[in-house]
């Protein structure tokens, strides 16, 4: 009897909360619709897999940080382009005043539709972010970068003035305000951040990010991006090999890594990543310098195979779909089509296995080699 009275009292409290704060203000978790997490894909299949859900989650705070020229803005611009291709609206808060529109166009960004703001100080930037997020009309908002969100007092003060903790307090207040609005409007906020070094650290890494600790706590995903190798065509540098580590992940298991190529003037090489993962998971066969897919030759050398996939986007999409289906990432359950005789246990084991780092690519093949045509 006591249990029944308690249940009635709880139901009455829930009803009162809904009347006062609106429907959905409180509910039992079993009553929530079980929908897959909506994502914005990156240009790297390996990173989508490492994130565990097929891309950057919607309605969350995401932090991307790393050393200078490591690919932070490039990775973010690819996410911007993919959000726009899906019909979304995107805003870019360029606090560094360094966005190159021509480079953004090369990565697929629709610069005519991109909402751009170049604020004068940190308070203005975060106030603009808050107003845009609360409009509910954005799919993605990018803040580049946290280090450039300089408080108004610091800008208006003298060069030698001390402003300890101002930026950290500014970030903490802003994140408290916008986090709930981001979730309700399904808007993703990507904060690009820089690295600094703590003085006097004897043990452990001295590296830290700017803006205090608030962003570390509020971020659902934190990605550490590093340049690990220079890609060369003979003696000419043509790009970088980049490694991303998911150091925090609230939507999937963390600490997974992904490697991909960033080519100068082109951005992330999606096709190069598909070749690496296709070979790793057995969809693309590598025999000597030749790459083949289901008996069709893609080309001699990775560069020719990459160009072949770039010229045949349907084939590239097919390879990507098979990789994601095998790993159970970024594919709706109803879209999965199990092949006869497939080893379900093996597929499940592959889905649970952490994403392995792809070894650095070999040097480009001789320029005289040509990609073979696919079978008609």
From Swiss-Prot:
PROSITE patterns: RECA_1 (PS00321), RECA_2 (PS50162), RECA_3 (PS50163). The keyword Nucleotide-binding applies. It comes from the Bacteria. Residues 329-376 are annotated as: Disordered. Signal peptide: none annotated. Keywords: ATP-binding, Cytoplasm, DNA damage, DNA recombination, DNA repair, DNA-binding, Nucleotide-binding, SOS response. GO terms for cellular component: cytosol. Its main location: cytoplasm. It holds the Pfam family RecA. ATP binds at residues 66-73. It is found in: Cytoplasm. One of its GO terms (biological process) is SOS response. Residues 338-376 have a biased composition (Low complexity). NCBIfam families: tigrfam_recA (TIGR02012). Can catalyze the hydrolysis of ATP in the presence of single-stranded DNA, the ATP-dependent uptake of single-stranded DNA by duplex DNA, and the ATP-dependent hybridization of homologous single-stranded DNAs. It interacts with LexA causing its activation and leading to its autocatalytic cleavage. This is Protein RecA. The lineage of its organism: Bacteria, Bacillati, Actinomycetota, Actinomycetes, Kitasatosporales. The gene is recA.
């Amino acid at each position: 009897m006591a249990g029944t009275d308690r249940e009635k009292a709880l139901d009455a409290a829930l009803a009162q909360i809904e009347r006062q704060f609106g429907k959905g203000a409180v509910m039992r978790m079993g009553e929530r619709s079980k929908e897959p997490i909506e994502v914005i894909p990156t240009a790297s299949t390996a990173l989508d897999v490492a994130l565990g859900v097929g891309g950057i989650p919607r309605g969350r705070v995401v932090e991307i940080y790393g050393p200078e020229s490591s690919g932070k803005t490039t990775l973010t611009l690819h996410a911007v382009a993919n959000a726009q291709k899906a019909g979304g609206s995107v805003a870019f808060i360029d606090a560094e005043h360094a966005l190159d529109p021509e480079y953004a166009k090369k990565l697929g960004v629709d610069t005519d539709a991109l909402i751009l703001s170049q604020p004068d100080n940190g308070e203005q930037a975060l106030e603009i972010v808050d107003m845009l997020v609360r409009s509910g009309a954005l799919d993605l908002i990018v803040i580049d970068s946290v280090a450039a969100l300089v408080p108004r007092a610091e800008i208006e003060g003298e060069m030698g003035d001390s402003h300890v903790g101002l930026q950290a307090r500014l970030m903490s207040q802003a994140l408290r305000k916008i986090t709930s609005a981001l979730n309700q409007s399904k808007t993703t906020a990507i904060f690009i951040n820089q690295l600094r070094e703590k003085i006097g650290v004897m043990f452990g890494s001295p590296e830290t990010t700017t803006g205090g600790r608030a962003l570390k706590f509020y971020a659902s995903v934190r990605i550490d991006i590093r340049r690990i190798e220079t890609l060369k065509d003979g003696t000419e540098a043509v790009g970088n090999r980049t490694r991303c580590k998911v150091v925090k992940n609230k939507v999937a298991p963390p600490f997974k890594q992904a490697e991909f190529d960033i080519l100068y003037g082109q951005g992330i090489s999606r096709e190069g990543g598909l070749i690496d993962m296709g070979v790793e998971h057995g969809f693309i066969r590598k025999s000597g310098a030749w790459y083949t897919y289901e008996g069709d030759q893609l080309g001699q050398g990775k560069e020719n195979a990459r160009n072949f996939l770039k010229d045949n986007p349907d084939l590239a999409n097919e390879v990507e779909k098979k990789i994601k289906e095998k790993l159970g990432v970024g594919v709706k359950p109803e879209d999965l089509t199990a092949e006869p005789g497939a080893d379900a246990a093996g597929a499940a084991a592959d889905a649970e296995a952490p994403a392995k780092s792809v070894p650095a690519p070999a040097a480009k093949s001789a320029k005289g080699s040509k990609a073979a045509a696919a079978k008609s």
